[in-house]
Amino acid sequence: PVWGPTIIEMYSRFGDPESVNVLSLLKTDLVEISEAIISEKLNTIKLEFEEKAVVVKCVSPEGYPERRDLAKGHKVVVDEEREEVLWASADLREDGSIVSGGSRLIECIGIGNTIPEASEKAEKLTGVVRLSDGWKLFHRKDIGTESLLSRRIELAKLAREIYLYR
């Protein structure tokens, strides 16, 4: 039998978009945290976060993830410069244009006092990006909704129960 914590997924990098949620609320200097980790003095730092809700919605070109070749090379237009929009898979060309790289293009970050408020802000931000050639973009509209959160909570409870009785 296996006892204790079980690894179900492991990265040696920041998970994306999961890390965007956490880093968006981080008040402590990330460089200071990194230096403390390297010097093995993380216990000397107080990690502080804003007490807010964050929802991140990833906007991707049609074709992702199965046909990344179709999702590549489309010129990107962002209607507004927004600090709540994080560029992901995009390439800057020599002429200054930005084209899709074939994966998640932009992450729209909604921050609010509640998850529904943050979700609404992120959803609105998805409308500021388009592809000039008319190629379709998509994103998951269910991210941050009450129904998805309820399903995820139930799955987490089930995973805990299975873990306890294995």
Task: Give the positions of each predicted feature.
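A cross-kingdom feature marking charged/low-complexity
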Residues: 142-166
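Short arginine-rich
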Residues: 124-145
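Short beta-strand elements
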Residues: 1, 5-14, 90
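Short, well-ordered beta-strand elements within core beta-sheets of diverse protein domains
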Residues: 58, 104-112
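Short, conserved charged micro-motifs
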Residues: 4, 65-68, 113-120
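Short, flexible turn/loop "capping" segments at secondary-structure junctions
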Residues: 49, 98-103
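Active-site "cap" helix and flanking loop/linker of ATP-utilizing ligase/carboxylase catalytic domains
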Residues: 11-82, 93
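Short amphipathic alpha-helices in soluble, non-transmembrane regions
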Residues: 70-75, 119-127
